[in-house]
Amino acid sequence: MNKYTGISTLENMSQAEFYNKWTFDKFKDYVRGDILEVGCGIGNFTLTLSKYGKITAIDIDQSLVENLKKDKSYSINAGYGDIEKNDYFFQKKTFDTIICLNVLEHVQNDTKALGNMFKLLKKGGYLILLVPLYNFLFGEIDKSIGHFRRYNPKELVKRVQDLGYDIVSYRKLNLIGLIGWFITGKILKNKQITGYKIKLFNLVSPVLYLENLIEPPIGTSILIVAKRNK
């Protein structure tokens, strides 16, 4: 698994408060019980998740984990974890919900990582997976923040099913972000998402509510909710 190289991008994305809340609202009904956040980063979703259950947060970057543990607003159990290597600071623990948001694309052997998450999931538990879509969008930003790939939606859904998960739902998200990502990363060849671009995105983000009415045919990301039934 790639150690995250886009800390500034994570910090800038923390300012996309409307988008982060809108995204969380898409899966919050499945967040419960013992929660594992895979790749917590700087904690853009961690505090919100901690209000829905008992949270364990892992990241391959120990320094990010230590910063989270210093923040007294969190009530979490945080430590080192590499989902690809099946190596964690905890032992013999399973979870009701596993959250993996914009992490799988940083993992070289993503199939192995998905399989390891299945092992960590209790029977009846949910995996919530958010990943970037479409290799035609793969550009300088993806390279600079350590992405190995972007995903084909049908292929990823099938791969998740083949590993034993039952698909509860999946949908493409953030059509307007796709346009910005293509211009920024492919045409302008920028290597990061700047704070200025996030401010522009915040201005147009209310348009995302239209996606609550109808799923866009394409999007920047796909959100998959899967369940372990066996």
Roles of regions detected by a PLM:
Residues 165-175:
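Conserved S-adenosyl-L-methionine
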Residues 3, 14, 88, 174-230:
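A C-terminal cap/extension of S-adenosyl-L-methionine-dependent methyltransferases
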